C-alpha cells in the first residue's frame, strides 16, 4: 500500500487551527469555554484547564502575541462552521441574464406577454437583456425600435433600472435591465 504524501498531510493541517499538543507557544491568552477572558497563562496550564473541562484547546489567533487560544469542543466547532457555510450557500442567489427578443412591429398583445415575462424576471432578481431584431427595410426605421425600448424602460421603471442604454449592434438593438436594489 502506498504511503500518503507528506506534503498533502502538511497541507491538510495548515488550513486548520492548531489544537491541543500542536500549539507551540510557551504562553497563550486563554479564553474560557463560556467566552470569558482568563488572561495570559502558560501552555501547560491552558492544556490542563481544557483537559479538566473535557474539551480541546484551539488556537484561534495564531499571529497574535501571545497567541489567543479558546477552550471548546473542536468537532462541534467544525460542525457549526460547516452548517453556517451550508446556510450561506442556500441563501446565495445566482443572478442570471435572461434574454427577451422582440421585433419593431411587435403587436400589443405580444408586447404585453413579453412585458409580463420581463417583470417576472426582474422580480426574481435576474437581469434582462432585451434584443430588438431588425429585418430588411426595418433598418431604415431604427427610431421605431428605440421608441419601443424606451416604452419598455418606462413600463418597468418601478421594478428595474437600465444598466446598459439601447445601442445598435449590427442588425440588432440591445438594452440591459437590472432589478432595482432592495432596501
Curated annotation (Swiss-Prot):
GO terms for biological process: ribosome disassembly. InterPro entries: T_IF-3_C_sf, T_IF-3_N_sf, Translation_initiation_fac_3, Translation_initiation_fac_3_C, Translation_initiation_fac_3_N. Keywords: Cytoplasm, Initiation factor, Protein biosynthesis. Residues 1-21 are annotated as: Disordered. GO terms for molecular function: ribosome binding; translation initiation factor activity. Residues 1-13 have a biased composition (Polar residues). It is found in: Cytoplasm. One of its GO terms (cellular component) is membrane. It comes from the Bacteria. Its main location: cytoplasm. It holds the Pfam family IF3_N. Belongs to the IF-3 family. Monomer. IF-3 binds to the 30S ribosomal subunit and shifts the equilibrium between 70S ribosomes and their 50S and 30S subunits in favor of the free subunits, thus enhancing the availability of 30S subunits on which protein synthesis initiation begins. NCBIfam families: infC. This is Translation initiation factor IF-3. It comes from Acinetobacter baumannii (strain AYE). The gene is infC.
Amino acid at each position: 500500500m502506498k504511503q500518503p504524501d507528506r506534503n498533502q498531510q502538511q497541507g491538510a493541517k495548515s488550513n486548520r487551527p492548531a489544537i491541543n499538543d500542536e500549539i507551540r507557544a510557551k504562553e497563550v491568552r486563554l479564553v474560557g469555554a463560556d467566552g470569558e477572558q482568563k488572561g495570559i497563562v502558560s501552555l501547560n496550564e491552558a492544556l490542563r484547564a481544557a483537559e479538566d473541562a473535557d474539551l480541546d484547546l484551539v488556537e484561534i489567533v495564531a499571529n497574535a502575541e501571545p497567541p489567543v487560544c479558546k477552550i471548546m469542543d473542536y468537532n462541534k466547532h467544525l460542525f457549526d462552521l460547516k452548517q453556517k457555510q451550508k446556510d450561506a450557500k442556500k441563501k446565495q442567489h445566482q443572478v442570471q441574464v435572461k434574454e427577451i427578443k422582440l421585433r419593431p412591429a411587435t403587436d400589443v398583445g405580444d408586447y404585453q406577454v413579453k412585458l409580463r415575462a420581463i417583470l417576472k424576471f426582474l422580480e426574481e432578481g435576474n437581469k434582462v437583456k432585451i434584443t430588438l431584431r431588425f429585418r430588411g427595410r426595418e433598418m431604415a426605421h431604427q427610431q421605431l425600435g428605440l421608441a419601443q425600448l424606451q416604452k419598455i424602460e418606462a413600463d418597468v421603471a418601478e421594478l428595474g433600472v437600465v444598466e446598459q442604454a439601447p445601442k445598435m449592434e449590427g442588425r440588432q438593438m440591445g438594452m440591459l435591465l437590472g432589478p432595482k436594489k432592495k432596501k
